[in-house]
Amino acid sequence: MSLGRVTVTAVRNLHPVTLNPSPRINILYGPNGSGKTSLLEAIHLLGLARSFRSQRLSPVIQHEQPACTVFGQVLWNDGRVRNLGVARNRLGELQIRIDGQNVRSAAQLAESLPLQLINPDSFRLLEGAPKVRRQFLDWGVFHVEQRFLPAWHRLQTALRQRNSWLRHGRIDPVSQAAWDRELCLASEEIDSYRRSYIQVLKPVFESVLHELVELDGLTLSYYRGWDRERSLGEVLAASLPRDQQLGHTQAGPQRADLRLRLAAHNAADLLSRGQQKLVVCALKIAQGHLVDRARRECIYLVDDLPSELDEQHRRALCRLLEELHCQVFITCVDLEALREGWRTDTPVALFHVEQGRITQTHDRE
């Protein structure tokens, strides 16, 4: 799967552009501030209907423009073609179109265009709050288990009902019991999908990590969000007074986490910044392998790689990306830092970016 064509209008400083990228490696090079990251942001907007640089979309829309738009043509390996379009205006209104039809759910975009982002903020996967790691985990489960999303929606509905009751106490005992039962059923289902996914992810992650860096003793484990020796129903009953005091549900899948440990310590506390970056890269590439096993592929957006890794590790990462046989968009300031990182038979397209203008220069010599 790859983006065969992408058209970007009014995204930050980018001039209107239509690109026909390589189905494999695409290198965007040019000075800092030229718009390289903005193109990655536009592709991210196309796949997830949101930016990875700003929680608000208004900064993404070009100055004095009413809206930004991104269109893309997704080419599947079996010959299918899917046309995607996303538009955001300054009022925050979102329009999503798939094959000419308006759709309401960004999940349909994510399903059509699986994206993995590796950028300087990727450290947050190790250092950040559990929510960041849950999002990483659920991205993977979503793309390999079709039953996950309906269960997740059921969980969110049940949680909202229970938390509302905890804050206001306006629910009869029969309804309360029914929502608790629904919460437990959805939670157990989600936990089973997550556990199954982690069991498959761990050996792939360990293998990929070994290709990047030697970190003996690094372990990846999954915490489901409540005591593994007790049912969620038991935990909810025991924690009810505290939940009422706080006004929200403390235990459940919404408290799940991935834990990376090294020598019995939080790995983020012991690893250097470079080692953390390599661990995150290994996690995200491992996820790509699992998506590939599900007979799909994801597209990698890699921002400013040369400034994050030395030449040895940069070449190792490029080799791992090549082995996935997926499409990659990767940015750099100095083209020479990435030009020679690929096999001679790998299609590589080069795009020069300067002052918001993107020009395809030539393929690798």
UniProtKB/Swiss-Prot annotation:
Repeat recorded as keyword: no
InterPro entries according to UniProt: DNA-binding_RecF, DNA-binding_RecF_CS, P-loop_NTPase, RecF/RecN/SMC_N, RecF_2
Keyword Heme included in the entry's annotation: no
Localization (cell): Cytoplasm
Pfam family, one: SMC_N
Lineage, top ranks: Bacteria, Pseudomonadati, Pseudomonadota, Gammaproteobacteria, Pseudomonadales
UniProt-listed Gene3D superfamilies: P-loop containing nucleotide triphosphate hydrolases, RecF/RecN/SMC, N-terminal domain
MF-aspect GO terms: ATP binding; single-stranded DNA binding
Sequence similarity: Belongs to the RecF family.
Protein's UniProt name: DNA replication and repair protein RecF
Gene Ontology BP, a term: double-strand break repair
